[in-house]
Each structure stands twice: as structure tokens, then as C-alpha cells.
Amino acid sequence: MKNTLVASNNNSDVGSYTELEGMMNLARLMATSKVTIPTHLKNEGDCLAIVMQSAQWGMNPFSVAQKTFLLNGVLGYESQLVSAIINKNAPIKQRLQYEFIGNWDKVIGNTKEKTSQKGNTYRVNASTPADEKGCGVKVSATMNGENKPRELTLMFAQVTLRNSTLWAEDPKQQLAYLAAKKWARLYCPDVILGVYTKDE
């Protein structure tokens, strides 16, 4: 079929896709969407970038588009999507494994209310360095062809940039997402090359 979107097996190079014309047609269609993609992608060029990137990841471009945001003129990806990209495309035997360490009792639910410049209220994490001491997560996965898992430990206190209210609502989840991204940047950086989140 002329307009079928097909990615090559190596998933490494946009130039290896067999139907660029199909991608361009899909991008034009996406750009006309009223509710299924965010407003910052209402143009063919950005939609084409999403289509090409989605093909490389083996994902639905409309789903990927919903997990993007625009910050200071740069297109970013939500942490949930980045974690999914890693689990789907990293050369690992199984999904990333997480082990939380430390006493989180003084961190989870420890929030305070703040007011934005526009007058909107939101909650932020209110834990102190003493509360966060020892709290962290270990993320690990075994690479294909290896028997020993590769690990990375990220402590909550190491995270100084917490740009999302989710750091207050669900700090364990946010730390796990960030640890997964750091693990991938260390052990298989090509999988998320050029992918940035709000924490960066």
C-alpha cells in the first residue's frame, strides 16, 4: 500500500523508513485534527516530526502527540511516555525493575499550598532534607546478551528541580520516572536521544 507507515527492523534511522510520503500524508491529516492533538502541534512540520519519531519508537503518533508539551520554544515529552519508550525500545530482557529504599513516611503527603503569579493555587513538596534522607529508588534491568542487571540508584534529595505538582502528589512515581531516564541515558542513550522532560 502506497501510504502505509512502515519502519525498518533496526529502528535507528529515519532515512530507513520505506514510505516517507505516507508519513507526510499522515502529518497533514494530524495537523487538521481538532481535539486529538495539542494546539502546539497544529502544523504539518511539527506533526511530521512526531510521526517520524513515533515510527522509530514503534508507537501510535496520536498517542505520542498527547504526551508532548512546549516549554520555552522546545518540544518536550512527558515522563510517562519516556518510561514507555525505554521499556519498549531498550535492548533489555524485561521491563525496568524498581526498588524503593528508605523511610518515605515523612515525604509522602508532606505538601504545602502555594499561589502562582496568576492567582492559582497548587501544592508543592514540603519535605525537608532531613525528611528525605535515605529515600531513593534503585532501577535495574538486564541487557540482552548479559546475565547481570545494570543498576542505577537515585536519591530523592538529589532531585533539586521539581517542576511538576506530581512531585507533591506522587513523589515515588516521579522519582522512578526520572531514575528510568537517567538509567537509559547511562546504558542505552540512543534510545532516548533528543528526548527531554520538564525536569531538564
Show where each model-derived region lies.
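Polyanion-binding surfaces on beta-sheet-dominated domains and ring/shell assemblies
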Residues: K2-E200
